[in-house]
Amino acid sequence: MNHHQQQQHQKPGEQQLSEPEDMEMEAGDADDPPRITQNPVINGNVAMADGHNNTEEDMEDDTSWRSEATFQFTVERFNRLSESVLSPPCFVRNLPWKIMVMPRLYPDRPHQKSVGFFLQCNAESDSTSWSCHAQAVLKIINYKDDEKSFSRRISHLFFHKENDWGFSNFMAWSEVTDPEKGFIEEDKVTFEVYVQADAPHGVAWDSKKHTGYVGLKNQGATCYMNSLLQTLFFTNQLRKAVYMMPTEGDDSSKSVPLALQRVFYELQHSDKPVGTKKLTKSFGWETLDSFMQHDVQELCRVLLDNVENKMKGTCVEGTIPKLFRGKMVSYIQCKHVDYRSERIEDYYDIQLSIKGKKNIFESFIDYVAVEQLDGDNKYDAGEHGLQEAEKGVKFLTLPPVLHLQLMRFMYDPQTDQNIKINDRFEFPEQLPLDEFLQKTDPKDPANYILHAVLVHSGDNHGGHYVVYLNPKGDGKWCKFDDDVVSRCTKEEAIEHNYGGHDDDLSVRHCTNAYMLVYIRESKLSEVLQPVTDHDIPQQLVERLQEEKRIEAQKRKERQEAHLYMQVQIVAEDQFCGHQGNDMYDEEKVKYTVFKVLKNSTLTEFVQNLSQTMGFPQDQIRLWPMQARSNGTKRPAMLDNEADGNKTMIELSDNENPWTIFLETVDPEMAATGATLPKFDKDHDVMLFLKMYDPKTRSLNYCGHIYTPISCKIRDLLPVMCERAGFPQETNLILYEEVKPNLTERIQDYDVSLDKALDELMDGDIIVFQKDDPENDSSELPTAKEYFRDLYSRVDVIFCDKTIPNDPGFVVTLSNRMNYFQVAKTVAQRLNTDPMLLQFFKSQGYRDGPGNPLRHNYEGTLRDLLQFFKPRQPKKLYYQQLKMKITDFENRRSFKCTWLNSQFREEEITVYPDKHGCVRDLLEECKKVVELSEKGSGKLRLLEIVSYKIIGVHQEDELLECLSPATSRTFRIEEIPLAQVDIDKENEMLITVAHFHKEVFGTFGIPFLLRIHQGGHFREVMKRIQTMLDIQEKEFEKFKFAIVMMGRHTYLNEDEYEVNLKDFEPQPGNMSHPRPWLGLDHFNKAPKDRYTYLEKAYKIHN
């Protein structure tokens, strides 16, 4: 019977029971229902915490938080059991655990009956966010002989949808009820469960209370970063040094040392999980960087390197090397001559191979194993020539803190991807390493104590990361699982993370250690010295506490934001200099902002405003800015007396922020006690005055006036002349600024305001100008034309198409401009000729250049920008040309690669005549590339697909026949002198390409090679070696094959003589590619280590 196979399944065909009352039998349901007896908890190994927040006595009193327990459940009258029954709860990790027992019948096998035995967790909870991983032993007690008790193991992640786990067919009913077997006595059966649970997630788990430590928040797939940070935090000597780094002048958002100080300080003092977003932000990473899963060694090195550099020149300089640096010597010793090469190197961690190794000792033995250099692999000993030698490394020193990287993740060349090795690999709590040192010190043996075990669960594509730490080096272990910290046993921390799969243990084989941290026993007290508040500089404490205070204040403001509103006060001086519609530009105006309780009254606000602005209440008047139906925004009357008791939110009509124009007396008159003139809201009107100057094409603000509604326009002319500084007899032309693009001239000056102005209201604007015939010669002679031109103005961002992410520059244009007017304006900005510019539309669906504009485009700028949304930035692209646009538009942009004389490819763009041929393309190419001094001076165009040359294009071939595609590239190269003239009878140009094992896996730079009928292949090989500049030792590893129709035939280099027919298409298959010569060798070019979603770790600050 395969117990483990069954344990992975819930009760097949049965509904999951979540409400205990549904499973209990009520009195009357049966004549004599089975009675249930709960035995007390047999044992519970309560996990003690040594943190300062609690004592061991406290933990012993509160057994509900324990990590493991054994409890029993006795069912009497067992033979009458017909329904599922549940035991009373036993609390582990403060969650209720119950034994569930049921009879199990099989419809297709009526004579077979079994006992269902399950462990249930937290089934009565309404929460859907909790989870708890546990291992358990389910046992039916044998009354006669406890050793014959029947048990099975389970391992499961309990959560709201799978809150019970066990076996539908735990034992045959007949076996349990057979008195001879010993499982039943007096019709009673006792069920027992031993459960060992991890700390739960999604419930009120107080890590500080139970362990004395806090975790780190999971801020979005930061992988092992949390595990690494906890490991570094508990390297106490490092933590002390980090605190001592001077960061007083550092930018709080960019300083890595300050961010690390902040995380360490909060881990030491906080009662709740600590966030890491400020730390990753200080690295200068994009959001994507937090999700990139690379090895922990890389992150550890760049982080410690960054901190080490920041420590230079400070009192803690050298701390990182002192803690983590060791030295090793790499040597090569010749066997038969007196020659030895040595190089001493520093290391900060050791990468240990685990594949095929039983334990850490075997890995160290493999690390220092001597490699024999003999045969084809002899060592070049200079004047001694090639010699047999021994190559290896020896450790000179081992650091106080030893980081061991276990190579769980490795590249598999067969699958061309990284894989995870889940093999069992053992490591001890105490690690003696003297045998691996070149020279030992009897007074200080290299004995190490295990301090941290970093663990990964899952495969190469993802998973979960935790770290087990021995914080004080005393064998009391804790498990740090992101935000949850819990006590754990030594076995959980060490043995359970060996990996592999042991049928006797319920440990998933994909859960195993990938990094170990050992501390030298002689340095244990020094490295783990207690870190107290006295070790933290006072100025750092004050800075971090001030940050906390500010964050708390901002948090409080966010929480109370719904109680407040903003009132934006705009003063009259903000109207001066405004050159547009209405009184001011909302995007440029400087407001005085007040934070006001929504339920406060207008009277209270006016009192506060008066005190803040320094004017008595009779020297100020409030005019809320009111949006009109025509799209303008003008001041409107607010009656302080009538509306004084109304709330601000009521008066603002829920507008937030609420903008108010604050009218005050002239500051020069304020000291004399002058007050604002009275305003009769029923008979008076407030008007604003602007003066337009056609010569400067500008507006001048001339203040505001109160005037009776019955006043005639002519009565206002003297006031306007005075405000503008004109003589009183000056003739004026008047306009009403109604709305954008609508400015009406006032014709009759002898009518009242209500008849002269359209729908007279407070805040109406009159624009006036001199009636001067000289204005007719101005570009914009009247205010009406000025506002019309203003309405057509648009800010356009011009970005250089050739510069990625170019922010560009802004030019204010009229959307009535034609192509040449736009080009002329932009050319002035760039200090170039308009004819040397080409413009491109912006793509509508994404931010980027679209189709080019022809220089004879007949539309206006408005036509080009019509698809932009009203508030969307208007953007066009340009590129500067080396020829006039009229000539350029008749050419074609042709991207290709150029193979230079050093056999290196570079991307170029040439511009041949679009109606030309390949010859024109090659001639244009000669203008932009550098040819060899002693070369042929002749070029050719090759077409390349999948790193293979598939053809040479003839010079008279039309360019329009060369269609670009992502799967093909074009390459231009200078024809070698040896290939200019080919004897077609006896010679041929063949394609040569590189591949490794599979002919479809081509790579590198393909090339053409001249071969001669009957020539020895060794001579061909020699020419290839010279062309590729490959050392003899490396070239010996190459294999050569003729590849035809996807199949390759390896050549015997010593016997093969060149036969041109081997490289000709087969008869009847002329449409297929010609056979080509393949070079089979390993691709040593650096393969992109990261996919398009990945980048190498780099801390930018």
Curated annotation (Swiss-Prot):
Spans annotated as Necessary for nuclear localization: 70-205
Catalytic residues in the record: C223 (nucleophile), H464 (proton acceptor)
Acidic residues bias locations: 19-31
UniProt similarity note: Belongs to the peptidase C19 family.
Alphabetically ordered keywords of this record: Chromosome, Cytoplasm, Developmental protein, Hydrolase, Nucleus, Phosphoprotein, Protease, Thiol protease, Ubl conjugation, Ubl conjugation pathway
Protein's recorded name: Ubiquitin carboxyl-terminal hydrolase 7
Single annotated GO MF: cysteine-type deubiquitinase activity
Residue spans of biased composition, Low complexity class: 1-10
Annotated ranges, domain USP: 214-521
Catalytic activity: Thiol-dependent hydrolysis of ester, thioester, amide, peptide and isopeptide bonds formed by the C-terminal Gly of ubiquitin (a 76-residue protein attached to proteins as an intracellular targeting signal)
Organism the protein comes from: Gallus gallus
GO biological process, one term: regulation of DNA-binding transcription factor activity
Annotated stretches, region: Interaction with p53/TP53: 53-208
Annotated region (Disordered), positions in chain: 1-64
Keyword Lyase: no
PROSITE patterns the record matches: MATH (PS50144), USP_1 (PS00972), USP_2 (PS00973), USP_3 (PS50235)
Function comment: Hydrolase that deubiquitinates target proteins, such as p53/TP53. Deubiquitinates p53/TP53, and thereby modulates p53/TP53 stability, p53/TP53-dependent transcription regulation, cell growth repression and apoptosis. May be involved in cell proliferation during early embryonic development. Involved in the regulation of WASH-dependent actin polymerization at the surface of endosomes and the regulation of endosomal protein recycling.
Pfam families registered for this protein in UniProt: MATH_2, UCH, USP7_C2, USP7_ICP0_bdg
Any one annotated GO CC term: nucleus
PTM note: Phosphorylated. Polyneddylated.
